[in-house]
Amino acid sequence: MINYKEQIAKQIGSLVEMPDNEIEKFIEIPNNTENGDYAFPCFKLSKTLKKSPQIIAQELKEKIQIDTEIFNKIEVVGGYVNFFINTNSLTKQVLQEIDQKREKYGAEEQKNKNIIVEYSSPNIAKEFHIGHLRTTVIGSAFYKVYKFLGYNTIGINHLGDYGTQFGKMIEGYKRWGTEYNLEENPIEELTKIYIRINDLCKKDENVLELCRENFKKLEDGDTYCVELWNKFKDLSLKEFYKTYDLLGVKFDSLTGEAFYQDKTQEVIDILEKNGKLVESQGAKIVDLEDKGMPPCIICKSNGSSIYATRDLAAILYRARTYDFDKCIYVVAYEQNLHFKQIFEVAKYLDLDKKYTDGLKHVAYGMTRVPSGRMSTREGNVVKVNDLLNEAIQRVLEIINEKNPDMEDKEENAKKIGIGAVIFNNLCSTLIKDQIFDWNTVLNFNGETGPYIQYIYVRTKSVLEKAGYIPEFSHIDISKLQDKESQKIIKILYQFNNILNQVIEKNETSFLARFLIELAQSYSNFYNENKILGEDKEIQDARIYLTYAVGNVLKIGAGLLGIEMPNKM
Ligand code: ARG
């Protein structure tokens, strides 16, 4: 498709002393379409050219040679040169591309670039909390978008399956394991054991020492300890997969922290060799004072590795195994400092700059229920599976009330309920904290997942009523010149660009907003225009546009992890 900004930059670039890509950055999209589709502001040129922006704009306008296939006209308003695109040719390009690429519209060719997306990463034997839900759906969306854009993408669930707490879990299980029903409610029961042993440790120093020994044994591969640890892990994963299956989330690798346990020595050796390790109260640390950060502990005084060391080992391993161009970590902003530290220390691991430059923490904000924050330690825990099932249940109630005879009720309720929760996690700027409120999340008329699904279903029912989708080659493009159709075409045109912004800015909300805008525009189009029963040529063109909108809504929602119901 024509890249309009590039075209404008090329024209202007041949007339002024400024590189095309610089010019491209200045090109704006006017809020008011009366000022054209693109506008080039001349203020920046005013200084070097020693002329007023208005005069420069006027001169540019006179010199620019417009290709009428691309632009209908150019106008000067104030210090701007405004470009009006040839809407017929735009419409044709967009719909033709959709016709050719179908469910691949917006996708790109396979690239020779490896992207790691690390997401979810819950902790074994602990509750999968609402923060984990967020990383899971955000990470999964990035994973899908990267893949769609042709990147070789690797999704990693960096399980929190290691740490001194397992020494405690083992001790607790050894003492009271038979009292708890682990098969039924593994995480809840394991948490109870953990709390109980923790209390005991606080009272009895000897028990704490036993726990420490267990952990050491675990590190050294003791059969009993490893067996128990495996049991905790398997039980936990079975629980986690209930959530993943509901969400439709997948991973390419489940290599968690434990996997790196025997790989931390190399990290220590390299840092030692590079003279970066300093002794501090028996521990080994990397001083980061000159970077304005507290030191990064690499090795505790008892010799065991910590969370950060395993992350550093993971960076080495991932660089070698996947030769990544980018490795993004979708983790809550509470860990900002951790990632700043390990990314800094990673620079001392003799890695190619390509790798250290490719590390990126994509931080996201917390989810609050109206009554406060949701976390494991505080009482106010909301279990993710319960939340997802409640979403489905609530939708089912709405359906039973409004459309009790609907076919595939359960299946649709699941898609709508889950889709609503997913969308809610992706639609606002990721770094912002968010409030989880059922009334907002499930509002079918709001800026929500269900709204997008609702409009999608509407496009489906229009096509069903029509009974046919005309062939693109038979469409008279000039029948789509009305305001509402043109608005839709311009949005559709942006789709690939939006996907690229998602990965450049690490923001899923761009895609979420895009889908809302597309859905709203179709709704306007639908309200303002008769689709069926019009003159045949108009009808065909509008049916085709309807098909195009449905197609892109489905692709885009799919990339966010949202499935489309067949009825609503
Ligand atoms: N397991 C950690 C938690 O639940 C998150 C792990 C994040 N990823 C990492 N590479 N450190 O808080």
Across the structure, where does each feature detected by a protein language model lie?
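Beta-lactamase-like hydrolase cores
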Residues: 95-96
